Amino acid sequence: MSYPVSTSIHFRFDREYKVSLNDQIARIIRGGFTCLDFNFLDWNADLRSPFVGPDWERWIDGAGELAAKMGAKFNQAHAPVYNGLRFPGCTQEDIHEFQLRAIRSCAKLGIPWMVYHAIYTDDPNWMKINHDTFEPLLEEARKCGVGMAFENTWVSLQHVPLWQTEALIELADSYNDPYVGICWDTGHCNMYGGKPELRKYTDQYKEITKLGKRLKALHIDDNNGCIDDHIAPFDGIINWDDVMRALRDIGYEHSFTFEAHNAARRVPESLADERIAYMKRLGDTLVAWDNGFNG
């Protein structure tokens, strides 16, 4: 198997924006990554973020120019969310504007797929709610040549229909559009909340193979089943043989993208570069999988 190994450029850094975007990009590339994920969700948490300011396009252009100069490219993104992280006073109208900015940024950076959180609601009309929310964005995404990949949520969110892989497939298929697909977050699938009766739903091989060619993006991370911890593969309890075998069996052909922020955020600064480089080697090891890992 061979997929481009990618990571979020916010991999090491927090949401206080103490380190510039370009410094983050350079450090990740020096760690060995040549493919980058732009997590726009991380950049609408505070009014200090350049993404929410008037010069956002110049900021995006600068990021693309630096990555290209250093021999790297952006190949995946994460959209802002409607029901989650945002700065104080941020309205739904603001989030919609940032969603459009993210799509146009992907077009500028040559990113083919951006990951979206669906509207995870227990409302019986959840399908209509999602269509009403995302149809306007899909229209813009088509114009920009950017695909929308809906992400699976936690297994433990039993009150929300979209916790089920089948419901996620139903949502993606309802658009009947080549610009709509699915993102699989390995950590979310593992989030059974410590309830033994839910463990059966954390079978990565079974769930991933249901997706088939709908799978357009990955969030690779691990946890211990109770907290969405975003740690490195093999530091939690996920069976990585199952994950890699499933990707092989469905013929997955897109990016292998880490969303394992805490693999690098929690180590001392003196070890950060070493940890970033380790994650690239770990990604290379995973995508080279061939019928099992040793011990």
Q: In which residue ranges do the predicted regions lie?
A:
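N-terminal small/glycine-rich loop or linker at the start of catalytic domains
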Residues: 1-10, 75-86
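Histidine-acidic metal/acid-base catalytic patches
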Residues: 1-34, 68, 96, 100, ...
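Active-site acidic/histidine proton-transfer and metal-coordination neighborhood
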Residues: 23, 65-73, 83-184, 191
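Hydrophobic residues within beta-strands of alpha/beta enzymes
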Residues: 36-38, 75-77, 114, 148, ...
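Glycine-rich, proline-tolerant flexible connector loops at the mouths of alpha/beta enzymes
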Residues: 37-63, 121
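Active-site loop/turn elements of alpha/beta-hydrolase fold enzymes
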Residues: 38-43, 79, 116-119, 153, ...
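A short acidic, helix-capping loop that chelates divalent metal ions and anchors anionic groups
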Residues: 44-49, 83-89, 122-125, 190-193, ...
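Catalytic-core regions built around general acid/base machinery
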Residues: 56-69, 133-141, 205-210, 242-246
